[in-house]
Amino acid sequence: MAVPKKKTSKAKRNQRSATWKGKAAIAAKRAMSIGKSVLSGRAQGFVYPVSDTDEAEA
């Protein structure tokens, strides 16, 4: 079984954690932006499935 040769330093651990959190923050920001554009109706790059009941009511 593979085991690390030496303990990972706190600096390296914190650096990796900051990278992961930064990537998560970017993904969350992008998701919020897409969600806002979808809700406001300004989204141009999405295709929505339209059910038959919605067409009958409109």
UniProtKB/Swiss-Prot annotation:
GO terms for cellular component: large ribosomal subunit
Protein source organism: Synechococcus sp. (strain CC9902)
HAMAP family: Ribosomal_bL32
Signal peptide: none
Region of interest (Disordered), ranges: 1-23
Segments of skewed composition (Basic residues): 1-15
InterPro entries: Ribosomal_bL32, Ribosomal_bL32_plant/cyanobact, Ribosomal_zn-bd
Originating gene: rpmF
Similarity-based family: Belongs to the bacterial ribosomal protein bL32 family.
GO molecular function: structural constituent of ribosome
Keyword terms of this UniProt record: Ribonucleoprotein, Ribosomal protein
Gene Ontology biological process terms, A to Z: translation
Protein name: Large ribosomal subunit protein bL32
